[in-house]
Amino acid sequence: MLDAFSRVVVNSDAKAAYVGGSDLQALKKFIAGGNKRLDSVNAIVSNASCIVSDAVSGMICENPGLIAPGGNCYTNRRMAACLRDGEIILRYVSYALLAGDPSVLEDRCLNGLKETYIALGVPTNSSVRAVSIMKAAAVAFITNTASQRKMATADGDCSALASEVASYCDRVAAAIS
């Protein structure tokens, strides 16, 4: 995983050049948006339990067979595993948002996730739906449009960060399906 600063250094080093020009401008822009990025990550992590539990509840409401005997969320142990997986996925989405780079999500979370779910018999369509619900909630918290909870956030438009987190959730959904 390379953050924005490390990427610039690695690229400049590969060219045997000093950091300058467009690379410095990109870093200045990254720093200027830093408070918004931190607030966006905080909005997700402060509401992570709510985001994940709502996503799993929504997934189950749409597919009640998941909690019937033989369903993948039947028994407390399986439900706990489902909630745990949702927390892990959302945590790595927040790491990617903080770094401004999806590689931590790809390398440490998504690599092999579909194969693991298939081996365990986890219904991928339900998992994708839960990720979709998490995506909508995370975007709502970042843009401060969540109906039940408003947060103090940095001034300015956070739509780019909302789009960024949405793209990370889309990566998760694509990796699972």
UniProtKB/Swiss-Prot annotation:
Residues engaged in binding (2R,3E)-phycoerythrobilin 2: 158
Subcellular localization(s) per the UniProt record: Plastid, Chloroplast thylakoid membrane
N4-methylasparagine carried by residues: 72
Classification via InterPro entries: Globin-like_sf, Phycobilisome_asu/bsu, Phycobilisome_asu/bsu_sf
The keyword Nucleus is assigned to this record: no
Gene Ontology cellular component annotations, sorted alphabetically: chloroplast thylakoid membrane; phycobilisome
Binding of phycourobilin, residues: 50, 61
PTM (free text): Contains two covalently linked phycoerythrobilin chromophores and one covalently linked phycourobilin chromophore.
GO biological process, one term: photosynthesis
Signal peptide feature range: none
Pfam families tied to this protein: Phycobilisome
Membrane topology category: Peripheral membrane protein
Binding site for (2R,3E)-phycoerythrobilin 1: 82
UniProt keyword terms in alphabetical order: Antenna complex, Bile pigment, Chloroplast, Chromophore, Electron transport, Membrane, Methylation, Photosynthesis, Phycobilisome, Plastid, Thylakoid, Transport
Keyword Secreted listed: no
Oligomer status and interactors: Heterodimer of an alpha and a beta chain.
Similarity field: Belongs to the phycobiliprotein family.
Known function: Light-harvesting photosynthetic bile pigment-protein from the phycobiliprotein complex.
Protein name: R-phycoerythrin beta chain
The organism of origin for this protein: Pyropia yezoensis (Susabi-nori)
